[in-house]
Amino acid sequence: IGGAICMAKPLDFAYDAFSVGMGEHIDAISFHEYVIDETVVFRHVKALRGLCNRFNPNIEIIQGESGSQSRSDGRGAMRKGAWTPHKQAKQLLRHLMADLMTEVKFTSYFSCMDMIEALNGTVGDLVSYLDYGYFGVLGADFDAQGRSVGNYTPKPSYYALQTISAIFSEDVQKADLYTGTVPI
């Protein structure tokens, strides 16, 4: 796999890497997609496919990381949305389905549990890096002082992911649905 690309940025880096021969040495390329509107995935995957085709059409595309938070006070990507556990579950389902409708080899969800992002911490100052990202399908349980106690509780997104995983656990083939009208 040849690295991960943040699709919110232009593909200039990937183009430059392919231009100096990277495409000859990789089997797949991964992208990370943190977006509120999952429909942008279609054009981003199409653009990435076009770039790969120019240098090596055999390269597979992997959606290596995406997700959303379940609280609006979290740290990390997409932290400024009015997120709730219900909105997180809906976004998880919409984004996974959008991924599966493209040609990605597989799709990944970030993450299994809420965790410390440690984006602005100072070494030796524990309180400075207790900044949680609430991306998990399992929610961290906190004590009265706001510290994680090491227990995790399933969120609605956990059950959504469990259900969609069960639906697609066997051999599944993508099929185009007819969206036109039947002539009379």
Walk through the language-model features, giving the residues of each.
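Noncatalytic carbohydrate-binding groove/subsite architecture in carbohydrate-active enzymes
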Residues: 1-107, 117-119
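Aromatic- and carboxylate-lined catalytic core of secreted/periplasmic carbohydrate-active enzymes
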Residues: 96-184
